[in-house]
């Protein structure tokens, strides 16, 4: 996403488009943008910044490539809406790792952070560490080993961008649904992710 911003600023549109098309291929293959294109990291995604790449490229590309990118964007959005939703209706970071991988991640965190998880559920700790990895905030104090419990503002803002972009540029028959989803997310973010003060 951020490399593409530089490529576009440097008028290397074709290079930026090829980056986005490569990601679109992976999204269509897996349903999401893998954390890395290696088998061991397919249990978690990247944050959904692909939509930013699409928005940045739309003014420069033809209809055929726009359709490919928007289709991948919609597929990734559907993944987040089916696999990473909290009871409040907002999205969260997570993973699909097995128990063994989660326990391994807890062990890895103990070594990296020089911290012992006494009497803790190692699988739960590992689950949340992998969720932090999905967020891009690997081994940081941001989520206090409870990442999968948070409706992260950045994540939900990125998905709001998906909803508004797909409403504007996606299939016309789905426009009303995406507008409603964006309005619902906006209301929930004000309700659950703010301190109640006027944010406008």
Give the location of each predicted region.
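C-terminal capping/lid segments that line or modulate ligand- or cofactor-binding pockets
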Residues: 44-64, 193-200
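Mid-sequence acidic-hydrophobic segments that form the walls
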Residues: 26, 30, 53-60, 76-83
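Structural helix-adjacent loops and short alpha-helical linkers that scaffold large soluble proteins
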Residues: 8-20, 57-74, 167-186
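Catalytic cores of carbohydrate-active enzymes
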Residues: 77-98, 157-200
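Substrate-binding groove/exosite segments of carbohydrate-active enzymes
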Residues: 1-51, 55, 151-153, 164
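Alpha-solenoid repeat scaffolds
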Residues: 29-30, 64, 87, 173
């Amino acid at each position: 996403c951020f490399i593409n911003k530089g490529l576009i600023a440097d008028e290397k549109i074709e290079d930026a488009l090829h980056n986005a098309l490569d990601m679109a291929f992976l999204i269509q293959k897996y349903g999401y943008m893998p954390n890395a294109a290696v088998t061991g990291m397919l249990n978690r995604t990247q944050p959904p910044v692909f939509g930013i790449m699409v928005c940045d490229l739309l003014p420069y590309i033809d209809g055929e490539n726009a359709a490919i990118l928007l289709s991948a964007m919609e597929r990734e959005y559907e993944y987040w809406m089916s696999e990473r939703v909290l009871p409040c209706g907002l999205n969260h970071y997570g993973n699909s790792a097995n128990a063994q991988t989660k326990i391994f991640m807890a062990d890895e965190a103990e070594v990296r952070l020089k911290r012992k998880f006494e009497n803790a559920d190692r699988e739960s700790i590992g689950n949340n560490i992998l969720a932090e990895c999905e967020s891009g905030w690997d081994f940081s104090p941001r989520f206090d080993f409870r990442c999968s419990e948070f409706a992260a503002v950045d994540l939900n803002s990125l998905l709001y961008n998906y909803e508004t972009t797909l409403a504007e540029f996606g299939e016309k028959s789905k426009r009303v649904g995406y507008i409603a989803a964006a309005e619902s997310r906006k209301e929930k973010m004000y309700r659950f992710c703010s301190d109640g003060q006027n944010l406008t």
